[in-house]
């Protein structure tokens, strides 16, 4: 039987990124935080639903805070120190996600609101009658 040359397991070297971007998508139902490098390649991400919150608790500011802390600690393995924050959406987790990223230890250099605003595009959904 022929011997198969064994490959020694090589440890994957993570690229070191000093500056990153945090994209916070805060909808009424969930909050998604993605931390990327300057080119937009995702380093880490977390959601309120993936952090253990289900149903109406996903849309709370505390759930957004927990998700931002999880995404922030995962991105620290890449050496990210400074973050530029882009916030999209009207959800309740906007402010608390930014505060959580600050408390993890990131220096926030810029906060930009990139919420899409229609120039009278699609017709909005009808108003709720409760």
Swiss-Prot record:
This protein's record includes keyword RNA-binding: yes
A GO MF term: rRNA binding
Domain of life: Bacteria
Quaternary structure (record): Part of the 30S ribosomal subunit. Interacts with proteins S7 and S18. Binds to IF-3.
Signal peptide, first to last residue: none
Entry similarity comment: Belongs to the universal ribosomal protein uS11 family.
InterPro entries: Ribosomal_uS11, Ribosomal_uS11_bac-type, Ribosomal_uS11_CS, Ribosomal_uS11_sf
Keywords: Ribonucleoprotein, Ribosomal protein, RNA-binding, rRNA-binding
Lineage summary: Bacteria, Pseudomonadati, Pseudomonadota, Gammaproteobacteria, Alteromonadales
GO cellular component entries: ribonucleoprotein complex; ribosome
Name under which the protein is recorded: Small ribosomal subunit protein uS11
Family annotation (NCBIfam families): PRK05309.1, uS11_bact
Gene it is expressed from: rpsK
A biological process from GO: translation
Functional summary from the UniProt entry: Located on the platform of the 30S subunit, it bridges several disparate RNA helices of the 16S rRNA. Forms part of the Shine-Dalgarno cleft in the 70S ribosome.
């Amino acid at each position: 039987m022929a011997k198969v040359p064994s490959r020694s397991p090589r440890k994957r070297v993570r690229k070191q990124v000093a500056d990153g971007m945090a994209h916070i998508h805060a909808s009424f139902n969930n909050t998604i935080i993605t931390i990327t490098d300057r080119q937009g390649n995702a380093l880490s991400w977390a959601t309120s639903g993936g952090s253990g919150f289900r149903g109406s608790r996903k849309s709370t500011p505390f759930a957004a805070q927990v998700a931002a802390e999880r995404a922030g600690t995962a991105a620290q393995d890449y050496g990210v120190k400074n973050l530029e924050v882009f916030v999209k959406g009207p959800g309740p987790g906007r402010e608390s996600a930014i505060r959580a990223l600050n408390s993890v230890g990131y220096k926030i250099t810029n906060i930009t609101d990139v919420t899409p605003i229609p120039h009278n595009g699609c017709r909005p959904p009808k108003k709720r009658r409760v």
